[in-house]
Swiss-Prot record:
Function noted in UniProt: May be involved in transcriptional regulation.
Gene: ZBTB22
Compartment list: Nucleus
Biased composition (Low complexity): 180-198, 217-229, 452-461, 608-618
Modification type Phosphoserine: residues: 202
GO cellular component: chromatin; nucleus
Source organism of this protein record: Homo sapiens (Human)
Domain BTB as annotated: residue spans: 57-121
The protein's name: Zinc finger and BTB domain-containing protein 22
PANTHER family: AGAP004733-PA, ZINC FINGER AND BTB DOMAIN-CONTAINING PROTEIN 22
Length: 634
């Protein structure tokens, strides 16, 4: 190896590149990771500066007349809504709903570049709306959390004010230890809380349809208020219940004050009902709209399959959450309480008696082993069960014939009744007069009510469960109504499901048959067939006496009777010859007495032999209108 050359000063000079030793190779498995954490924020900050200066912006957003420019790449990465608009649809100008506040949207747009969001407490709902429309869920979650915290602080403030500075009506001494507060203070606090609750709940909020949080709010405020005003006078039953007479510190009753607090807490309740004063019960405050008689819905505690009365309010507060999903609904008709022997009515005055009939209870949540069956809005009579008693009942199989199968003793049959279009049950009562006549030989007398004829809308629809008998006649060949097992909500019964479905279409005003020429719609197929004759111009019915043609069969029948009568009385008439085309005369079975005013024998004797023709189908003329013309006799 040659020594490196020396400089005039004696220092070694660097070797040329070609003479430098090669660098040591790095191991093949070695990977060098270098991180630049400030690049991300610097990149977004640079993009935000370009947005503010209007540089390289390729999309515009309009909100209530204001236009904002931005980068489509940033919008697509920050919002699923913008991702669909700019990538899937390729839009360069986007108009947002007018429900959004332009100022709130401008702040949210800036947060997509900076990651920071500043908002006033009064504008949280506006930002929640913007986040919901743009599907920016991190903003929705944060606004929801802020609203929940604000509501909790407002609840604490109202509870403290109600417990310390409330004036009892009629007493001159304030109930709290503080100064005297006017009674309007409570009303203003209540209205303030109501307005805050209504403002903080927007349709786009994630907890807008969350009744549980509203329940927690109402329960906590009621419990705190009751603890401060009454002490230990609180009873829980799906929610706190205040006793009506409560004596304040000054000796005067504060019942009015407690009722006002109950109204305040009911505004955010779960909608299950209001508290009945003095009874400790809840009564429903909402009934679903329906064209049928309204029913009262009362939540009761699950009592298994036992028909004995059950308490209306859960007694154990620790089991309230478990029993909340095991509710039953008691349905009571107002105008049918006298007719139902086992019907019940919830006492408003707080009486201990509340007679509950198992036939009036419909299950909302079935046991896990039973499940909920698919219920048709028009149920057949084989779904009916007995109203009273628990003996085995035979049903009808799918083919319509009776089968000797019976219900299991552990699961008595549930009384399923016909439903109207809104899902309300139509009550069907057994006929007491026909129960004794339709009883089969050897049948116990106690089951007459469940095997008798069922009165539906004034018609008798035979026996519903006696093997081998329909309508009380052995052998299953009784009256014609015995085989009509398909019921409509209006009370009519049909022997075939297709007939019932066609009848239901009449109720629903469905017109499935369209005319291909004029687009008119018809409910029945034969109506369309008759209507098509008006487009073809065919007149298939021709009088055999005067050779006059008719389009409609009923018009032809009326004319034929009058024409034949005139021909018999006058003895003159144009009788068609052998070459005259004749239309279809009616069959012999339709030439019954009443046509022409006389009997059938007189008509045959008076009519000339040449005018009595054998019935033949009408002639068919083809018309080029896109469909085959025709339309013979029905």
């Amino acid at each position: 190896m040659e020594p490196s050359p020396l400089s005039p000063s004696g220092a070694a000079l660097p070797l040329p590149l070609s003479l430098a030793p090669p660098p040591l190779p790095l191991p093949a498995a070695a990977v060098v990771h270098v991180s630049f954490p400030e690049v991300t924020s610097a990149l977004l900050e640079s993009l935000n500066q370009q947005r503010l200066q209007g540089q390289l912006c390729d999309v515009s957003i309009r909100v209530q007349g204001r236009e904002f420019r931005a980068h489509r790449a940033v919008l697509a990465a920050s919002s699923p809504y913008f991702h669909d608009q700019v990538l899937l649809k390729g839009m360069t100008s986007i108009s947002l709903p007018s429900v959004m506040d332009p100022g709130a949207f401008e702040t949210v747009l800036a947060s997509a570049y900076t990651g920071r969001l500043s908002m006033a407490a009064a504008d949280i709902v506006n930002f929640l709306t913007v986040g919901s429309v743009l599907q920016m869920w991190h903003i929705v979650d944060k606004c929801t959390e802020l609203l929940r915290e604000g509501r909790a602080s407002a609840t604490t403030t109202i509870t403290t004010a109600a417990a310390t500075s409330v004036t009892v009506p009629g007493a001159g001494v304030p109930s709290g230890s503080g100064g005297t507060v006017a009674p309007a203070t409570m009303g203003s606090a209540r209205s303030h809380a109501s307005s805050r609750a209504s403002e903080n709940q927007s349709p786009s909020s994630s907890n807008y349809f969350s009744p549980r949080e509203s329940t927690d709010f109402s329960s906590s405020s009621q419990e705190a208020f009751a603890a401060s005003a009454v002490g230990s006078g609180e009873r829980r039953g799906g929610g706190p219940v205040f006793p009506a007479p409560v004596v304040g510190s000054g000796g005067a009753t504060s019942g009015k004050l407690l009722l006002e607090a109950d109204e305040l807490c009911d505004d955010g309740g779960d909608g299950r009902g209001a508290v009945v004063p003095g009874a400790g019960l809840r009564r429903p405050t909402y009934t679903p709209p329906s064209i049928m008689p309204q029913k009262h819905w009362v939540y009761v505690k699950r009592g298994g399959n036992c028909p004995a009365p059950t308490p209306l309010v859960p007694q154990d507060p620790d089991l309230e959450e478990e029993e909340e999903e095991e509710d039953l609904v008691l349905t009571c008709e107002d105008d049918e309480d006298e007719e139902l022997g086992g019907s019940s009515r919830v006492p408003v005055g707080g009486g201990p008696e509340a007679t509950l009939s198992i036939s009036d209870v419909r299950t909302l949540s079935e046991p896990p082993d039973k499940g909920e069956e698919q219920v048709n809005f028009c149920e057949s009579s084989n779904d009916f069960g007995p109203y009273e008693g628990g003996g085995p009942v035979a049903g009808l199989d799918d083919s319509g014939g009776p089968t000797p199968s019976s219900y299991a003793p552990s699961h008595p049959p549930r009384p399923l009744l016909p439903l109207d279009m809104q899902g309300n049950q139509i009550l069907v009562f057994p006929s007491s007069s026909s129960s004794s006549s339709s009883q089969a030989p050897g049948q116990p007398p106690g089951n007459q009510a469940e095997h008798g004829a069922v009165t539906v809308g004034g018609t008798s629809v035979g026996s519903l469960g006696v093997p081998g008998s329909v309508g009380g006649v052995p052998g299953g060949t009784g009256s014609g109504d015995g085989n009509k097992i398909f019921l409509c909500h209006c009370g009519k019964a049909f022997s075939h499901k297709s007939m019932r479905d066609r009848h239901v279409n009449m109720h629903l005003n469905l017109r499935p048959f369209d005319c291909p020429v004029c687009n008119k719609k018809f409910k029945m197929k034969h109506h369309l067939t008759e209507h098509m004759k008006t487009h073809t111009g065919l007149k298939p019915y021709e009088c055999g006496v005067c050779a006059k043609k008719f389009m409609w069969r009923d018009s032809f029948m009326r004319h034929r009777g009058h024409c034949e009568r005139r021909h018999r009385l006058g003895g003159v008439g144009a009788v068609p010859g052998p070459g005259t085309p004749t239309g279809p005369s009616l069959p012999s079975k339709r030439e019954s007495p009443g046509v022409g005013g006389g009997s059938g024998d007189e008509a045959s004797a008076a009519t000339p032999p040449s005018s009595r023709r054998v019935w033949s189908p009408p002639r068919v003329h083809k018309v080029e209108m896109g469909f085959g013309g025709g339309g013979g006799a029905n």
